[in-house]
Amino acid sequence: MEVLYSLSKTLKDARDKIVEGTLYSNVSDLIQQFNQMIVTMNGNEFQTGGIGNLPIRNWTFDFGLLGTTLLNLDANYVENARTTIEYFIDFIDNVCMDEIARESQRNGIAPQSEALRKLSGIKFKRINFDNSSDYIENWNLQNRRQRTGFVFHKPNILPYSASFTLNRSQPAHDNLMGTMWINAGSEIQVAGFDYSCALNAPANIQQFEHVVPLRRALTTATITLLPDAERFSFPRVINSADGTTTWYFNPVILRPSNVEVEFLLNGQIINTYQARFGTIIARNFDTIRLSFQLVRPPNMTPAVANLFPQAPPFIFHATVGLTLRIESAVCESVLADASETLLANVTSVRQEYAIPVGPVFPPGMNWTELITNYSPSREDNLQRVFTVASIRSMLIK
């Protein structure tokens, strides 16, 4: 993997910097590195493809070295270099796609394609120029079963989940009380509602709670907490739990009271915040518990009193909600990230070449299914293909 990264980094620099008119002295170190790459690769043969619709291609390396000059690089020099650069880039692209297309239930962190296995040989270690990539560093740690740490801006750690629970219901569905939520990616929105606006609740207060377990622990997380759940702020028709009917939800939004968010790790509370909105920090957690209250307003203007009558029918439904967004966090497991294109790159390659469903990844790389059942085998394979996708993205946009 390190060799693949070094090849790609060298080729990217060569493509960007070996241009007509450049002083040779400005790129002499790069050209020496480029020539070392050619010397190491010359005389070797590789084969890529042969899975799905990814065609089999054979690669041979027999290229001349780039010379020295005291002057600027001229058109002939650059054209000669370009021919070599483009062939190498095409080779790297196909090695990456071949690797992305493959998966294994055992030792999925290791190279799976014939070409990358060959590049992992001792004879190619002379190409190991630069391993400054975060993904390369973490691939090495994961490969040695040591602790890794990935910094994500918005970790897609929450499988999609959208549902409701009713704490009070009737066959007519005309006086309901409960919670509804949507969890996806890095955001949680939860709403508590009571058609009667806590009319008969103790002290006219309804208590709500929403617990969200994560598939992997996060550390040093920056989180935004807001006293609103905008996705539940408009009327909608909802299918009943048994699917036999539908019920009407017509929210009127109140501000939640006594809001508390707890971050837990292995059942132990690590951080607790009460009535604090905006930016909050969580040190280490694998579960989030949100609790909040709906308090019936003790004093109402006539207009508000008309919204929340003392007896049915209840046309408007008192609702309070919270939004929690994980803006950034460190995770020891590889995850899709809203600010990166690695999952999209991997999925598009597998779709474009009709890669058959294997023993590890779900059909279509369905992220919700993948993260819901996030096994060590999936984590290893995802670490490998994301690392390869990050290398490929250096050359192929």
Swiss-Prot record:
Ca(2+) binds at N266, D286. Transmembrane segments: none annotated. Residues 62-73 are annotated as: Interaction with the inner capsid protein VP2. InterPro entries: Capsid_hemagglutn, Rotavirus_A/C_VP6, Virus_capsid_a-hlx_vir. GO terms for biological process: fusion of virus membrane with host plasma membrane. Keywords: Calcium, Capsid protein, Intermediate capsid protein, Metal-binding, Ubl conjugation, Virion, Zinc. Its main location: virion. The keyword Secreted does not apply. GO terms for molecular function: host cell surface receptor binding; metal ion binding; structural molecule activity. The N-terminus is blocked. It comes from the Viruses. The keyword Ubl conjugation applies. It holds the Pfam family Rota_Capsid_VP6. GO terms for cellular component: viral envelope; viral intermediate capsid. Zn(2+) binds at H153. Homotrimer. Interacts with the inner capsid protein VP2. Interacts with the outer capsid glycoprotein VP7. Interacts with the outer capsid protein VP5*. The VP6 trimer contains a zinc ion located at the center of the molecule. The zinc ion is not essential for either trimerization or transcription activity of the DLP. Zinc-depleted VP6 has an increased sensitivity to proteases. Belongs to the rotavirus VP6 family. This is Intermediate capsid protein VP6. It comes from Rotavirus A (strain RVA/Pig/United States/OSU/1977/G5P9[7]) (RV-A).
